[in-house]
Regions:
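Flexible, glycine/small-residue-enriched loop-and-beta-strand segment within the central core
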Residues: 42, 69-77, 82-172
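WD40 beta-propeller repeat fold
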Residues: 62, 66-68
Length: 175
């Protein structure tokens, strides 16, 4: 299942969350760990570069967050990122450097690597989006199966049990 592994699909130098991926094989393995990781990393961020805006919310001073955007922690908004009009960040969200979270886009339990774009009316939940990944307008990473059972990844050499009830999308770099 090499084609699904973190090291095959993601440049970990393109995320502030590099340490989150230590010791994992598949990208979905980080999903249950995002919130705790943000709280630990946020406490260590340089106050010259990041400001704390509420409970467990850190925003780079160079980031642009529109007044109508809502950010619920834990969350880290990276340098030069944009969180645009009416964006809704529900928590457990890492928004990478230079990333764009657009108009009416909703994020929950995600890692967006640097320069990711989710610019228009997107829902991204329980997902990892690699460096320069882009989701078109209205894209949704529906994250719960209709029968509410645990998600399996169907791979060429057989199914992989994720142990997760919620699972959105794993987009590699430049997808």
């Amino acid at each position: 299942m090499k084609e699904l592994m973190v090291r095959e699909n993601y440049n970990l130098d393109e995320t502030i969350a590099k340490d989150l991926f230590e010791g994992v094989t598949y990208p979905w393995e980080v999903l249950p760990k995002i919130g705790t990781f943000i709280k630990e990393l946020g406490a260590e961020l340089d106050p010259e570069e990041y400001e704390k805006r509420g409970e467990d919310v850190w925003v780079a001073k160079s980031a642009k967050v529109f007044e109508s955007a809502y950010i619920h922690g834990p969350a880290i908004i990276g340098k030069n990122a944009e969180v645009r009009h009416c964006a809704f960040i529900r928590g457990n969200a890492i928004v990478g450097e230079g990333a764009v979270v657009g108009n009416s886009t909703e994020l929950k339990n995600v890692v967006l690597f640097n320069k990711v774009q989710v610019p228009h009316y997107n829902y991204v939940g329980d997902s990892v989006l690699g460096y320069k990944a882009h989701m078109g307008a209205g894209s949704i990473t529906s994250n719960v199966k209709s029968d509410k059972t645990l998600v399996k990844v169907h791979a060429p050499k057989g199914d992989i049990e994720t142990g997760l009830k919620k699972f959105g999308a794993m987009l590699g770099d430049e997808v």
